[in-house]
Amino acid sequence: AAAMEKTAKEAGVKIVAGDTKVAGKGQVDGVFITTTGIGEIQEGVETSGFMAKPGDAVIVSGDIGRHGCTILLAREDFGIDADVTSDCAPLWGTVQDILSVTKDVHVIRDATRGGVGTVLYEIAEQSHTGIRLNAEAIPVQESVKGVCGMLGLEPLYLACEGRLVIFAPKENAEAIVAKLHEGKYSTEAAIIGEVTEEMPGRVVVTTEIGAETLLPPPGGELLPRIC
């Protein structure tokens, strides 16, 4: 309860109601927490996955994949000793930082289950555009890279619980990233790619050696939710 109060205050959220449930003895291991959020639409702000436009910069608000990697190592006995912690963080302050620079932002999405890669494919399909990523620009901790390398995982498809994916006109991108670097949870924000007219509905990655490869579309079993 103390942790929830602390985080709610940090995020500027009021907890206004609550109830309890009754479960059979031995049927519950831990605490169930279910929330419903009610908020306000910001005046002058319109964002949607359908609004991505060719020429937009693709931004992430920090290094990716840490939460999914952390949960995977905690749940499975791989015998891997890696220094990885979750990226879990409240995001409203990060959104406010973005909108303090400009309200001309086309997409703001959290990259939870399925990670950044799933979000990018959803946006590419919704907006009928292509997305080209620069592999060298994608921020991934070395420990996460190491775990992914050993297990054959793609960091772009690991869940994040404290990261945003932002699509904004290219002329605003550097200013947005500079502002994010001042934030508590977005010091590793980076421009990782751009929206294109080519290959609508697809995400292409330019590798470190300059080759272009198609990011495999999402498939298979995603890491289960914790709920």
Region spans (language model):
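Helix-biased detector of long, well-ordered alpha-helical tracts
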Residues: 1-227
